[in-house]
Amino acid sequence: MKETLSSKVPTTRTVGVTFDSVSESKSKLKSGSVQGTTATATATGPPSPPSSYVIKCLLKTARFMWQVTTIPAKIGDTLGTLYRYAQDSVDTFLCVAGKARRKERDGDQNSTDTKLYLEESVLERKLPEADLKALVDLPAGLDYNEWLASHTLALFEHVNLVYGTISEFCTQSGCADMTGPGNRTYLWFDEKGKKTRVAAPQYIDYVMTFTQKTVSDESIFPTKYANEFPGSFESIARKILRLQFHVIAHLYAAHFREIALLGLHTHLNLTFAHLTALHRRFNLIDEKETDVLRDLEVALRLTDDTSGQDSSSSVHEHSSSSSSPPVQHQQHQHQQQHNNSSSTSNSTSPAEALHVNSQSNSNSHSNSSNSHTTTASASASLIDGDSAAPPICTQPEAGAGCKPAGSSGLLGGILGDLTSGEFGDTTRYCTSAVPQAAASSSASAAGPGADGAASAALNNGAGALHLNFSNNNNNNHNLNHLNHHHHHHHHQHHHQHHPHGHHGHQGHQGHQGHHQAPASTTVPHSGLIQCNAAGAVGASAGGGGNAVSAATGGATSASSTA
């Protein structure tokens, strides 16, 4: 037994050694095969899938092209490889084309979703086109930089106010990019000129911060007597207006539904029309920037139309001499609208509302030298003022006052109702509350002193145009310089550094006591453009004929005066 055990021990040991060697060889073979497989997979396997779907398709095609170049062992393999290559080539073409078509469909769907502002129901109320041209025309004798600064400040305030109402809907997650209509994306350029992709709230905050800092700079927007505008002021104003246009484009593309539900779409349309008219008049923004909202310009009839020059002149009763250069137009209708308005009535409000084409003296209203002269280039675009086309703003019934937004849907002569606390008191804007027949009868009963009011009523409710530039930012520039100042530094401005970036502006009363008239007082309103034919009719019926603003106490009483 011992010998047997001793004789079997070497055998067992040998077997064990043999087993170990076999296991070692197997493990080596396995490891070698694994390594070979790994190397093969690394060499012949496809690369990591790219992020782009199109690149994946192209790489897939390149792989089969490599397979065709290899010499197969049999002719059948060659035919099979060629067939697979042809099939994959077709699939590659279809996948790229399908991806492009899918993007196009998605873009069309997004474009349709973001163009709610083109619906007829939200385009029916706005100021007449002719008044917008009169709003931006440079008055005779007024400095161009002063005029441009006033409009820049007004547009900055209006855009900031409208955005402030929906700022809670514009979030980092909901608006990850600063987008505009047509899948337009805006990138922010920092101080070093580096492009940065930021979210829409941050982009708009940058815009408002930059604008507020710029308009508060005394060296750029001078308010003191000894200071002058810098030579580069126009380029700075162009940049501010371009950035404000980006904000407007984002509001239309991403938040127009909320704005329409709040009843503020008319104010946004009016702000856009104001900016477009100013840009068209002085060519301030590149056409590539404004192309994204060109369809809205067409819907609002703000596009260039050479045939609209004659009709615009007929609406305004412009007298343009054929021998005089085409760059100057005498605006007689607005002169008639303010024939009986004195110089004190033009500056009674502490907010210094702009009476477009107002007279510097009530005793010289018949003198044509006091009418404002438009200075424009011969190639300047004219806003379509087709008198044959009916106004979009519908006229309410006689004796019916302005109703708040929502009481009559989108109908009526109201341009909007601002009820937010950020806008101060409730302020309503009406194009007209008196039909043409009633306005004509009241004007004829008032006598010849009401010619301006009658012409305003017959102009489809165009009325006397009022613009308040100095409610929320006392950094404004007096736009009645033609009547009261021959230099833009005769008055003091106080730059109230209010919170930028759509924080609610509180109305600061500026120019206190500068042009006070004990005869009439006007409470500052929200600062948006007012078309107030009813005020002119009511004043003419009373015998005064003053086309002053009827917005007293923060609300426009349009029909109570009729």
UniProtKB/Swiss-Prot annotation:
Chain sites annotated for binding Zn(2+): 170, 175, 250, 255
Composition bias, Basic residues: 482-514
Entry-linked SUPFAM superfamilies: Mob1/phocein
Pfam families, alphabetized: Mob1_phocein
Source organism, top-level taxon: Eukaryota
GO molecular function, one term: metal ion binding
Stretches with biased composition (Low complexity): 31-45, 305-349, 357-378, 471-481, 547-562
Gene3D superfamilies listed in its UniProt record: MOB kinase activator (1.20.140.30)
Any one Gene Ontology BP term: cell morphogenesis
Residue span of region Disordered: 30-50, 304-378, 468-523, 538-562
Signal sequence bounds: none
Keywords: Cytoplasm, Metal-binding, Nucleus, Zinc
Location(s) in or outside the cell: Cytoplasm; Nucleus
GO cellular component: cytoplasm; nucleus
Function: Required for the normal morphogenesis of a variety of polarized outgrowths including epidermal hairs, bristles, arista laterals, and dendrites.
Family as reported in the entry's similarity comment: Belongs to the MOB1/phocein family.
PANTHER family (alphabetical): MPS ONE BINDER KINASE ACTIVATOR-LIKE MOB
Quaternary structure and interacting proteins, as annotated: Interacts with and activates trc, also interacts with wts.
Name of the featured protein: MOB kinase activator-like 2
Organism: Drosophila pseudoobscura pseudoobscura (Fruit fly)
Designated gene of the protein: Mob1
